[in-house]
Structure formats: C-alpha cells, structure tokens
Amino acid sequence: LEDWQSGQDHVGLYLYNGNEYLEATVACYKSRTVPFNINFRYVDEELIYLLNNAHVKVLIYHSSLSERVMNIRSEVPSLSLLIEVDDESKGTLLDGALAYEEILCTAKNGFPAIDHKPDDLYMIYTGGTTGMPKGAIWRQVDMLVAALGGKTSKGTVIESLQEFQERAMRGYHRYLASPPFMHGAGSWVALKALHSGSTVIIQNDVRRLDGDDIVDTCIREKVDALMIVGDAFGRPIADALVRKPRPIPSLRNIITGGAVTTANLKTQLLELLPEINIIDAAGSSETGTQAQHVSNALVGAKTGKFTLQRGNAVLSDDLTSVLEPGHDGLGWWAQSGHIPIGYLDDKEKTAETFVTVDGTRYSVPGDRVCLLEDNTLELHGRDSMTINSGGEKIFAEEVEQALKHHPDVYDVVVTSRSSDRWGQEVIAVIQL
C-alpha cells in the first residue's frame, strides 16, 4: 500500500459525546476496523462528501440524527451497515438498521482470532485545514505515542503492555473532555485518560456548550482535569463563574488546545480559580501534541510561545532546510518522528504536507512560527487561507466557492477578523 492508502474497513462515528462513542472506538480497534470522526453539524451535502471520501462501510449514529442518515444513505454506495444508538428521541429504527444495545446484549462471549499489528490504522478527519475535510491516517503505534498517552511523565516511550498496566493501576485522575469527541481535542484526552487508568467524565448537555453545566459537572464529579478548546469554550465557563461564583476544589488543570486561549481570558480564569494550572497544548490532526506551555498564578498568563521540544523543527519557506534559532522572517512549524503516513486517497496533498529534509520526514500542517534565539517558538497562526474559528479550521477559498454558487453573487473575498468568543470569525466582502 502507498502512504495515502488504507487496507482496512472504515466505520463512521456519527455520534454526540457519550460512552457509546468511546465503546465503539475501542471495539473498532479490537476488530481491526478503522473508526473515524464525523461532525454532527454537517448538512447533507457535507455528510455525503465525507462518507464517500472515507469509503464508509459501517455508520454508527444517534437516533436523533436518523433523519439525516435516511436522507443521504442512498448517496453513499459503500455503506453496507447501519447501527443506531438510542438517545431517547422519538422515531422508529431505520429500515435495515441494527440497534446498538441489542447488538451488545446478543453478542457472543470471547474474542475472535484477530492478529493486531502496530501499523493498524488510526484515522482522524481534519476540520477543513486542507480545504475539504481529509482523513489523516496514522499507524496506531505512532498515534499512541503522539497524542494518546504512549509516553511516561518523563517523555519516554512506553514499550510494553506491562508498563501500561502498571501505570493504569495507579491511575486516579478524573478528566472532563468538554469538546465533542469528533474533535481531536475531545477524543484524544478521553483516550489518553483511559490508557492511563483514569476516569472520563461527560457533561449533561453534549449538543451545545453550557458553561454552567461544565462548572456544575466539575464540582459534582470531582473533576481534576478539564479539556477545553480556546476562548470559544473558556469564555462561557468564565462567564458562568462570574454570574455565580463558586469554587471547584478538585480542579487542578485546565488543558486547552485546538484554538487560541488569549492571555486576558487566562488571567480571568486564574483570578476566578487561583489554584489551577492552564496548560496550552499545541498540535494538529497531522502532528499530535507538539508542545505545551503552563500558565498559573505564580508565573502569570502568556499565550503563543512554546519551548522547542524533541521532534520539533522550523523549516524554511521553500521546505528545503531546517532554520536555526534567531532566523529572519517566519518559517513552517514541523514535526518529525511519530507522525501520520498520509491523507486517505490524496497523493498530492500527502506529498505537500509530509516532506523530507536532510533525510528526516516531517509533517508540516501549515502553522507559521518564528524560532527565537533562546529556542522559544513564537506562533503566528495558520497560513492566510486558513481561518481558525472556535477550533474549527475553515478554508477561505472553499467558502468563496460556495458563496459564488449563489446566482446574485458576482464576486467575493473571504477573510477573518478577531473575535472575543471564537478567536477568529469569518467575514466576506461580496459584490452583487
């Protein structure tokens, strides 16, 4: 197989957060099928594109999403099995679909004879950084190390199942992964928690972000680590604490990734919850976790700077050389080592994103950075065509093309502006 090809069957997870999402994920890996994330906010056209691009064989979906599944199933010829998870919405099982709980209750005991391999695939669909969503495909052994807890607290790679078991026996953390599991920020922290023997907590309202619900869940379930996605998640939580001040005595760490958390918001959160650390975790679907930075009441709040870590590099504009500290201008933030093998069925984009420089293979998803004299990385955001809005990556050219389909639009330019809530928001100048 080439780097952009898969030899396994693919299972779509069209689900809100819940135990079924994580159960189905693990079950797919056990059966040597490849689960992949589906944005539950997609409209029919987007869903059809994604499912066909992924060559989906099985779709697991919540019953409240069944009408959309019914609308698009005939447009996805590879789809051969539907599994419906009951979320107490009204309606009957789709024709030919199987009920999730019934499958569990009637399953045979024991495990089938399956030969698992380190290069079995993990796949995560991008939110649009690459234009239309694409499936970044990894070897499971690489993803485990890159983002799912395959390293010790000292940063060394865990080499044996026994080491995982011994660590899990000591696991005690209680994680609330507030982002949707269909977002890497949500599913990665949940799987990392499970791999370390810790507990995954899920808030009551999983269809929208409710700051009070997040705070109350942290208090009730004694959460000590909360995952958020930048200001889009952090600000409603801060607002909830301002409206109704209350301590969260168990909370020690707020982990934020996928979008910028501004220094102003960090300062506010540290004033409201002075005992916590705010951990910036930078990375992408194409790199895993690349770097971390900690803010707390002792060191203050900063945003946008990270220490260069093992496997990180800054590449020149033409992607032919590694830049040294103190270089002129901006470079591309790159990651080597445990990185994806490519994008599903996209030879051209695989070649563009995964480059070899001086014999080392790098993933270069598009972040612009400057490596300062002291080896500090200063982030300058994605390239100008990509907009990060609340953790969702929006390709400006794709939005322009969609708007130009409207018969009254003569020309359009799409860009972004700063937003207190979303980090960036999409704006357009339209000529009619």
At which residue positions do the language-model features occur?
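Conserved AMP-binding/adenylate-forming
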Residues: 1-42, 252-377, 382-386, 393, 399-400
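ATP-dependent adenylate-forming carboxylate-activation enzymes
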Residues: 15-16, 33-51, 63-68, 198-218, ...
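Adenylate-forming
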Residues: 16, 61-70, 88-89, 179, ...
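Structural core segment of the AMP-binding/adenylate-forming
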Residues: 30-105, 115
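Conserved pre-ATP/AMP-binding loop-to-beta segment of ANL
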Residues: 105-125, 131-132, 137, 165-175
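Conserved AMP-binding/adenylation subdomain of ANL enzymes
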Residues: 144-177, 182-225
